[in-house]
């Protein structure tokens, strides 16, 4: 889990647009966040395995 201060800091509008970054909506992780889902890879994988994300299926070949 991210520190509450870092989550609050990311919610503020940055002074310059390029300073903005995404955080996982579920756990607050700042790295490897999928924009389409708003989730990090860890949360995305957990939710996909439990079937909580409609249309996401496990790939097999």
From Swiss-Prot:
GO molecular function: rRNA binding; structural constituent of ribosome; zinc ion binding
Cofactor: Zn(2+)
Gene Ontology CC annotation, any one: small ribosomal subunit
Entry keywords, A to Z: Metal-binding, Ribonucleoprotein, Ribosomal protein, RNA-binding, rRNA-binding, Zinc
Residues where Zn(2+) binds: 24, 27, 40, 43
Cofactor binding mode and count: Binds 1 zinc ion per subunit.
Gene3D superfamilies: 30s Ribosomal Protein S14, Chain N
GO terms under biological process: translation
InterPro entries cross-referenced by the UniProt entry: Ribosomal_uS14, Ribosomal_uS14_bact, Ribosomal_uS14_CS, Ribosomal_uS14_sf
Annotated Pfam families: Ribosomal_S14 (PF00253)
Function field: Binds 16S rRNA, required for the assembly of 30S particles and may also be responsible for determining the conformation of the 16S rRNA at the A site.
Quaternary structure and interacting proteins, as annotated: Part of the 30S ribosomal subunit. Contacts proteins S3 and S10.
Family statement: Belongs to the universal ribosomal protein uS14 family. Zinc-binding uS14 subfamily.
NCBIfam families: PRK08061.1
Stated name of the protein: Small ribosomal subunit protein uS14
Native source species: Frankia casuarinae (strain DSM 45818 / CECT 9043 / HFP020203 / CcI3)
